[in-house]
A protein has these predicted regions:
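A mature extracytoplasmic/lumenal domain signature
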Residues: 43-47, 65-67, 73-77, 116-120, ...
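Extended beta-sheet lipid-handling architectures
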Residues: 40-43, 54-58, 66, 71-73, ...
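Sec-dependent signal peptide recognition
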Residues: 1-8
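An acidic-aromatic
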Residues: 50-113
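Generic beta-strand hydrophobic packing signal
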Residues: 39, 95-98, 103, 154, ...
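Gly/Pro-enriched, hydrophobic low-complexity segments
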Residues: 109-239
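A short, amphipathic edge element
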Residues: 22-24, 90-104, 162-164, 222-225
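N-terminal leader/targeting segments and the immediate start of mature chains
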Residues: 11-51, 55, 105, 243
């Protein structure tokens, strides 16, 4: 009986220690994100999706903490929202049962992976029935650089089937701010629910654009995002974001 009690205490200690580590990783990553009070940047988007054509597009994007965004663009264009203008805390709040995994692929000790299940209510997807709600529970693997405390990649999957991937490249701007300079977003679609989710995650700047997958065929799409001409912590005012 005493051995069983000690064993239970041991596993409780491990569980509490892991939760403390997870909270530390999220807190440090969010702290790094919060150092950027506001910024202005030129964003270039190139989209490669079957049956959908859009020329390379340029946006002038303004951002101010916590969630003020202003986008200037001429003509039609789309801009993916996933992870671009949301804090790490907000993103991790959409996950449950978060666990820590080491990055065994490249044996890099300066990177860790936090993996969790998506909270379906956060997706705001209409499910046709309760069975779909129970079976459509994606897992998200978030790779964190523990030296610079930034998110390097996000992979969303159901078991081993990948739904979409985000990869970010960074460099120091003004020798001070570690900012993304390139993002690549890959979509793998073979389900109407997933296609609907993607459409929820695409922000139409002008017009109403939908990616259709009526035949449930596998669609692989790529969105390439490049960031240039950063102006960071200029002291933008809130009133600027409400001007038309």
């Amino acid at each position: 009986m005493i051995k069983l009690f000690i064993l239970i205490l041991f596993f409780q200690f491990i569980f509490m220690n892991e939760n403390e580590q997870i909270n530390k990783f999220i807190k440090n990553t969010n702290h790094q994100y919060k150092k950027i009070k506001d910024y202005e940047v030129d964003i270039y988007v190139k989209m490669e999706v079957p049956a959908f054509r859009m020329p390379k597009k340029k946006y002038k994007v303004y951002f101010m903490q916590p969630d003020l965004i202003k986008i200037n663009s001429k003509g039609f264009g789309i801009l993916p929202k996933t992870g671009l203008f949301t804090s790490p805390t907000d993103n991790f709040d959409n996950l449950s049962n978060i666990k820590i995994y080491s990055n065994s692929e490249n044996n890099n000790h300066d990177e860790i992976i936090l993996s969790g299940k998506i909270i379906l209510d956060s997706l705001k997807i209409e499910m046709p029935n309760e069975y779909s709600r129970l079976t459509f529970i994606p897992t998200v693997d978030v790779q964190i650089d523990t030296i610079n405390w930034v998110i390097k990649s996000v992979i969303t999957r159901i078991d081993t089937l990948k739904l979409f991937e985000i990869y970010n490249k960074y460099k120091f701007i003004n020798n001070k701010y570690y900012m993304p300079i390139e993002s690549e977003i890959k979509y793998f679609l073979k389900d109407k629910k997933v296609a609907n989710w993607l459409n929820k995650d695409i922000n139409s700047v002008i017009g109403d654009t939908k990616i259709n997958n009526k035949n449930n065929e596998m669609i692989e799409g790529n969105i390439f995002v490049r960031y240039d001409n950063y102006k960071i912590n200029q002291g933008l005012s809130k009133s600027f974001f409400y001007k038309k």
